[in-house]
């Protein structure tokens, strides 16, 4: 089974990232997970959690925290440039960066890879695989907009975490679930019936 890469950067919106992992695993998907160096601090400040850096300990952390046994979860360090997912020969269904910081987005847009997240995104673009980027920034400046345009021209999908009020959400969880489905539906990984 081809995996889905989830990358979490240091932008705000850790709740969406957590729910994404949970929903994919509950739907028996194979997930390759990369957290950027900055995302650990965001997780601590937004969610009050200390995520282990070591991949095996991190996998067990997520299994326990999200209370999910199904699916396959493989965790990678942000600086592991020799990871299998850094190569085009590692087949995936696609990659979702949620949330995506503007620094990460800018480096991907310019083909500059400092870490495993940026390298994987570059691989997805060069291999013509689905790359879905969920930038979490407001307001946007012209540099942000130009970088988003460059990625859209390179056929990345730009899916900001924008709520849909027409669904009449009753809770924050309803809003988060809508965003998660929006991110992963195009990969055939999850739909509203899976929640």
Spans of features found by a protein language model:
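N-terminal phosphate-binding or glycine-rich loops at protein starts, especially the Walker A/P-loop
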Residues: 2-39
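Short, hydrophobic alpha-helical segments
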Residues: 184-191
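Buried hydrophobic positions in well-ordered alpha/beta secondary-structure cores of metabolic enzymes
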Residues: 10-13, 96, 151, 183
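Short, glycine-/small-residue-rich phosphate/pyrophosphate-handling segment
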Residues: 126-179
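Helix-loop-strand module that forms the ligand-binding subsite of alpha/beta enzymes
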Residues: 74-146
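Conserved small/polar residues in nucleotide/adenosyl-binding loops
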Residues: 193-195
């Amino acid at each position: 089974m081809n995996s889905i890469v989830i990358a979490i950067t240091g932008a705000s919106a850790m709740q969406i990232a957590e729910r994404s992992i949970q929903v994919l695993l509950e739907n028996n998907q194979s997930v390759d997970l990369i957290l950027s160096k900055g995302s650990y601090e965001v997780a601590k400040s937004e969610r009050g959690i200390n995520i282990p850096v070591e991949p095996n300990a991190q996998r067990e952390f997520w299994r326990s925290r999200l209370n999910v046994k199904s699916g396959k979860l493989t965790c990678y360090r942000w600086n592991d440039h020799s990871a299998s997912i850094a190569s085009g020969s590692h087949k995936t269904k696609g990659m979702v960066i949620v949330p995506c910081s503007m620094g990460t987005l800018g480096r991907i847009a310019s083909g500059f890879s400092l870490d495993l997240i940026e390298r994987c995104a570059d691989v997805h673009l060069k291999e013509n695989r689905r790359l879905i980027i969920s930038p979490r920034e407001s307001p946007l400046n012209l540099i942000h907009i130009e970088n988003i345009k460059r990625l859209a021209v390179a056929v990345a999908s730009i899916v900001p975490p924008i709520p849909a009020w027409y669904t009449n959400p009753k809770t924050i969880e309803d809003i988060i679930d809508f965003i998660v489905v929006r991110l992963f539906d195009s990969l055939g990984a999850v739909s509203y019936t899976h929640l």
